[in-house]
Design a protein with these regions (language model features):
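Carbohydrate-active catalytic/glycan-binding domains of CAZyme proteins
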Residues: 4-18, 24-31, 35-550
Length: 550
């Protein structure tokens, strides 16, 4: 196991630095000049028999000491906020630290974001993930608070999977899965015992894993907030053998759960602490994390990376239809999106954008709903990144136009005017300063109400990418297409936000089309230096570019 950082990320790489490497029994943590920079979670302990000799290079190390017991860190307030006022595209401010699966909840005037803290793209803890829930919240979407971890890792056998926040008996709770089978064989965990109980009784049992001898805890558990905001305490109760439990209270007040990873189906209970009975063994399908929400006259279940179902709220449970098969889903490049209602009848979708194997920046978009229940997406006004003074690039453009870009992070806006309703094509090429090696093409086909990200190194339009219905993979945040839900019969606005950073190792491109659909992509190794517009059957007007504010 290696714990460390590139010295170049320090504010002052040269000169003398005080370095502390601490082992807590659960994790190794490296502190440099009093600040935490990296950690990883242990499996096993250092062998004293192999630690008799230390090799230190005096050209780099002037003094070294071993402390037993270990020096204990003391947490102090940071001199500057660690969370920017704008949360969009945020990542934890540490080396190789990312947002993993996101679950959200609105309670008592506060929007909560719980996210699996990810380092190394799921490669921490020797590839077992080492995930746990960190916690952010806001009351106004402008000021964000970073709370203590909701589910810290306290034992070497712990590594957690996704669940959901929910209310039970008036208390804020969060369910999550113990992904212990990534470390131990299933036979050495509590899962066989839990499945046996379920098969014998027809409902799940309730087990306090502190009282179980000889088996490692696995399955579903939950934590309870002691103050309704933060300060979560683990219950140590195992209540179901699934390892990604999505608990929610339905609109009729019933406690339900969608079982994922290791189980499937819809379940119901009177209490979180066991007694869960299966209502439908085959739906949802399990696997990815699933979330239920009701919006007006419609019920929806969104399932992880690629699944979405809906039905009229008045219809029975078996009436859910596959929205993806119909081609009317609203997946837009995010992974494992979670949906939450906020005041004003608004719904937010939060997820992570794939930049690592299992992590990236946090992204929040707002949903829109049509009378037939179809859902689209748009940017959320309150969290659009601030920009500097916009510069008009062109009042009107037909054919082709090229424009240099001086800022690697910017917002591009323009209006599309079709010559004929629902006719025409447009592409915008995002080019590096020199050459076309890492270029990205965003393309819009008005006749098909279809848009895509693609790779184009030619003068023509890139070949068609696949939508989710067609077998495409929007969740990769690379090349993909979206279809339907865009009204191209009249002029409309397009806004594109490009965020390039050294940490990203490239650029994020987030596009909003007519405030009806959004799509987002990550382009590694691309720093945009030039823009190229090409179009047929349309004109583009009021092209403006504004740099993002620091």
């Amino acid at each position: 196991m290696t714990v460390g950082i590139p010295l170049a990320i320090l504010d002052r790489p040269e000169g003398k630095h005080d370095i502390i490497l601490q082992f807590s029994g659960v994790q190794w943590t490296i502190y440099i000049d009093g600040r935490l920079y990296d950690n990883d979670f242990a499996l096993g302990y250092p062998l004293a028999s192999r630690m008799k000799l230390w090799s230190l290079n005096p050209d780099y190390v002037s003094e070294a000491n071993l402390y037993e017991p270990a020096i204990q860190p003391e947490q102090i307030a940071a001199p500057t906020p660690q969370i920017a006022s704008n949360i969009q595209y945020w990542t934890p401010p540490y080396h190789n630290a990312w947002v993993g699966d996101v679950v959200t909840f609105f309670h008592d005037g506060r929007y909560h974001v719980f996210y699996l803290f990810d380092r190394r793209g799921h490669a921490s803890k020797f590839g077992r993930g080492g995930h746990y829930f960190e916690h952010l919240s806001t009351t106004d979407f402008q000021t964000w608070v970073e709370h203590k971890p909701a589910t810290p890792l306290e034992y070497q056998w712990e590594t957690f999977g996704t669940g959901t926040p929910f209310l039970f008996n008036g208390k804020l709770c969060i369910s999550y899965g113990l992904h212990t089978t990534r470390i131990y064989p299933k036979e050495e965990t509590t899962l066989p015992m839990q499945w046996t109980y379920l098969e014998k009784n027809g409902y799940t049992g309730s087990f306090n894993y502190d009282t179980i001898q000889g088996l490692v805890p696995a399955g579903s558990t939950y934590s309870i907030s002691e103050d309704g905001v933060t300060n979560f305490k683990k219950t140590h109760i195992l209540y179901h053998p699934c390892e990604n439990p999505s608990i929610y209270t339905d609109p009729d007040g019933n406690l339900k759960m969608l079982a994922n990873y290791g189980a499937r189906g819809t379940w119901k209970a009177d209490s979180v602490n066991g007694g869960w009975k299966c209502l439908d063994a085959d739906f949802p399908l399990g696997g990815d994390c699933t979330f239920f929400f009701r919006w007006g006259e419609y019920d929806y279940i969104i399932g992880g990376f690629t699944r979405l179902w809906s039905k009229l709220a008045k219809d029975p449970e078996f009436a859910y239809k596959d929205v993806v098969v119909e081609g009317t889903d609203f997946y837009n490049g995010l992974s494992v999106p979670a949906i939450t209602e906020i005041p004003g009848g608004r719904f937010l979708m939060a997820g992570w954008l794939k930049m690592q194997n299992w992590g990236g920046p946090l992204v929040i978009h707002e949903l829109i709903q049509y009378p037939d229940g179809r859902i689209g997406t748009k940017w959320m006004d309150e969290i659009i990144p601030a920009t500097g003074t916009p510069k008009k690039l062109s009042a009107k453009l037909t054919g082709t136009g090229d424009f240099p870009v001086s800022s690697k992070s910017f917002m591009l806006t323009f209006k599309v005017y079709p010559d004929q309703p629902r006719q025409g094509n447009l592409k915008v090429l995002f080019l590096p300063e020199k050459g076309e090696e890492s270029a990205c093409e965003w393309q819009l086909q008005l006749d098909k109400a279809r848009a895509q990200y693609g790779t184009n190194l030619t003068a023509t339009y890139a070949s068609s990418e696949k939508t989710l219905r067609e077998g495409g993979a929007p969740q990769t945040a690379s090349n993909y297409a979206i279809e339907n839900g865009i009204d191209t019969s009249k002029p409309f606005m397009v806004r594109i936000l490009v965020d390039g950073s050294d940490k990203f190792g490239g650029s994020l491109i987030d596009t909003e089309i007519a405030a009806q659909r959004t799509m987002i992509s990550y382009r590694p190794e691309l720093t945009v230096g030039n823009l190229r517009f090409c179009m047929e059957g349309i004109s583009v007007q009021d092209i403006s570019l504004a740099p993002l504010s620091d």
